[in-house]
């Protein structure tokens, strides 16, 4: 049993010292095996995290991998929206985001409450959001797109579209 310290919650991560004799990588791999957990890391994470991960990719590839994993626990080393996306795709799995301070400026640039009001003020439109949005923003959209399929999806609708966040490269 692990005790959660308030300072860890305040910081958003655990930064306790690690004994030098501890083989942390082996300990993590063994814990993942025991707990049936998979570690997924975005390309933006540090190399040491990517080396430990079972799968490394962009947000779309990570979401696709999460949807297919048989693991009970997904450790998503990335930003909030990636963990949220994994939870949406895998509601019966436990999804952990190790660094609660890891945010995406693109996702943060579209507050869900403001976007919801904008959508309400423009009825009759198909609402499209980019994958780099929060779950709350995705909840008021009809279609979620990625940089690889945005053009095809947008062109498939006749007109009257609302689109949030730009399709910046990942």
Name these PLM-found stretches:
Residues 4-85, 89, 98-113, 117-128, ...:
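Metallocofactor- and cofactor-centric catalytic cores in central/energy metabolism, strongly enriched
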Residues 145, 149-151:
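Donor nucleotide-activated moiety binding/catalytic core segment of transferases
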Residues 154-162:
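Short, intrinsically disordered, charge-balanced linker/junction segments flanking boundaries
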Residues 93:
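Carbohydrate-active enzymes and regulators
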Residues 163-169:
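Conserved small/polar residues in nucleotide/adenosyl-binding loops
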